[in-house]
Amino acid sequence: MNKLFETKQLTVLSRLQTSAKNLSGLLAVVAVLCTVSCSDTDQPGPQLNIDTTLGQAVFAAPGDAANAFALALRNGDSEMLSKVLGANYREVLPLDAVDGEDINNFNKAWEKSNDLLPQGEHKVLITIGEGDWTLPIPISEGESGWYFDVEEGRERMRIRRIGRNELAAMQAVLAYYDGQMEYAQADRNGNGMLEYAQKFISSPGERDGLFWEVGDSDKPSPLGPLMGNLSPGGGYHGYFYRILKAQGENARGGAYSYMLGDKMRVGFALIAWPEEYGESGVMSFMVSHAGIVYEQNLGPDGVEITEEIPSYNPGEGWLAAKEVSGPTIN
């Protein structure tokens, strides 16, 4: 795997940093959207009726469940939260990862708009704010009353995480495309040639990668400011990335190398795959200088499969991603 990551991972995608950070911040605190009640939390909290089979409180109506949840959060009452959501509530409600400013921001959003969104006859979701953000933990109706379905909430959070990471990955490969197109517009290393970068991060004092250090008044490198906490062998938003230096027979124009001597001048490509299949992502992605993002579900063996992919070759199973696309080259 060390060879696989010789070019390091794409952890310097600054043009995605702000949007991806906001996305991850929203999802990190989406579980604490209800820091005020679904009605008047100044009223005394409801008496909790514990269902011994579920191991948590059940309620006569979904609004009562929401009120109890909100009251517990507002008071920082971990004991009440453990009754409302169950003893393992921290698995879906990571309070230690949320600061007071985040909670205040969501309090304001809640005050602007909040509702219970029906999901059929026996389930509702709490929505908040003008954008109708939803708490991923549904309130479901069981035999003894309404309760927070933490098990389903955990699965909903997993799906959200995958969706968020896959969107970031698609944006990342397009950021790579944009960066390479910009990089090749000038002679970056003084050798008199226009070429594409063969790695993400430049060698110290050089401009042989898509990122290099710049001064305050200098134009940013193609991938912009360096993201913090670089980790060798690490991924970016749940995905690994590798630069490809050739293409196969299924690519537009047929099979050929992107290299002329030791310079990558003919084209470029990139492949991205999940760090942990089914948890950080499902789909793998590829892009080349043609500007089309392809995707495929490589399954649980995706890491091993990508290790064996020597070139950009979107053949059987690879489909053009509909969510994003770059300018195409005819």
Model-derived regions, located:
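Flexible, glycine-rich surface segments
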Residues: 183-279
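Short, well-ordered alpha-helical segments enriched in acidic and aromatic residues
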Residues: 77-88, 194-197
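Short, low-complexity N-terminal intrinsically disordered segments enriched in polar/charged residues
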Residues: 42-71, 153-178, 182
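Short beta-strand edge/turn micro-motifs at domain boundaries
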Residues: 124-167, 171-174, 292-296
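N-terminal secretory signal peptides that target proteins for export/translocation
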Residues: 1-20
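C-terminal motif of bacterial Sec signal peptides marking the signal peptidase cleavage site
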Residues: 33-37
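C-terminal soluble interaction/assembly domains
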Residues: 269-316, 329
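Surface-exposed, charged secondary-structure patches
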Residues: 89-135, 230-237, 242-250, 255-264
